């Protein structure tokens, strides 16, 4: 049965005992409202580690001034039930006051990796992500931590953070989990109307178009961006906010493609902003 831990002190006590006994810890940090994408990461951890910890913590530092922290969905009982079904050992669900007992004396600034794509639209967001992930890594001390490739920019930033701060954890990127028709699974999908849900499948289809262009030898980013944009404009009613090609994981905008790339999409429907991406090319 999955155990619910609600304080930093108790979590640290469990971790210290686990480390003394040589137990491996897998960790999946989340903000709750869990879906199959999260559960895929939990299953991967359970199959690899002695203990799997899932954190459920809505982090106030990654919400901007126009983003409603209080309105973010919270469903800890349901989340606990879901992760129990796939074998998680611990859900770590601390209070905000326990993670941030006072004003932070040191600000973490991500830098250029956060100045593009989602980070450019949400200033300070990735600073908040890195701050809380640093804290959670120090509390849970995982051997392996699992992040979804759906948030590819976040994954690249966390990998850089681990390298720069010498965290003794291996980051495992998990492929995007999709519905049967290709739509990337997301807690935001419930906000789509029936018509928007039918249209939303074209995000993934447009990425497959981009992949086909690349495989056919196209290396001009503008050509790929234009073709993807044209496809989306003819298939969806939502507002296209972004079609971009960046190197990965360096996140440098590409004009002529020479290596591994990350093609990113963002579309705003009436009540949901959806993102999707594909990573193409050899590592």
From Swiss-Prot:
Active site per UniProt: 38
Q: Where does (R)-pantoate bind?
A: 62, 154
Primary localization class, coarse:
cytoplasm
Q: Which GO terms describe its cellular component?
A: cytosol
One GO term under biological process is:
pantothenate biosynthetic process
Q: What class of enzyme is it?
A: ligase
Answer whether the UniProt record assigns the keyword tRNA-binding to this protein.
Answer: no
Question: Any additional notes?
Answer: The reaction proceeds by a bi uni uni bi ping pong mechanism.
Q: What is this protein called?
A: Pantothenate synthetase
């Amino acid at each position: 049965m999955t155990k619910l831990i609600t304080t930093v002190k108790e979590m640290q006590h469990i971790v210290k005992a686990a480390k003394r006994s040589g137990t491996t810890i897998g960790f999946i940090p989340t903000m709750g409202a869990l879906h199959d994408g999260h559960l895929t990461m939990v299953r991967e951890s359970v199959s690899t580690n002695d203990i799997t910890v899932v954190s459920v913590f809505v982090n106030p530092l990654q919400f901007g001034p126009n983003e409603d922290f209080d309105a973010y969905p919270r469903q800890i009982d349901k989340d606990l039930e879901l992760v129990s079904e796939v074998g998680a050992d611990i859900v770590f669900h601390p209070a905000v006051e326990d993670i941030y007992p006072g004003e932070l004396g040191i600000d973490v600034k991500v830098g250029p990796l956060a100045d593009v794509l989602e980070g450019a639209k949400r200033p300070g967001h990735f600073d908040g992500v890195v701050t809380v992930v640093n804290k959670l890594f120090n509390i849970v001390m995982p051997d392996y931590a699992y992040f979804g490739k759906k948030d590819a920019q976040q994954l690249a930033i966390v990998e850089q953070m681990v390298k720069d701060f010498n965290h003794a954890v291996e980051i495992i990127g998990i492929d995007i989990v999709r519905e049967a028709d290709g739509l990337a699974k997301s807690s935001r999908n419930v906000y789509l109307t029936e018509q928007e849900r039918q249209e939303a499948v074209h995000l993934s289809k447009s990425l497959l178009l981009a992949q086909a262009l690349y495989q056919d030898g196209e290396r001009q980013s503008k050509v790929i961006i234009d073709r993807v944009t044209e496809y989306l404009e003819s298939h969806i009613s939502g507002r296209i906010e972004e079609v971009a090609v960046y190197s990965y994981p360096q996140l440098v905008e590409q004009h002529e493609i020479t290596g591994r790339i990350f093609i990113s999409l963002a579309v705003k429907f009436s009540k949901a902003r959806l993102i999707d991406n594909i990573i193409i090319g050899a590592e």
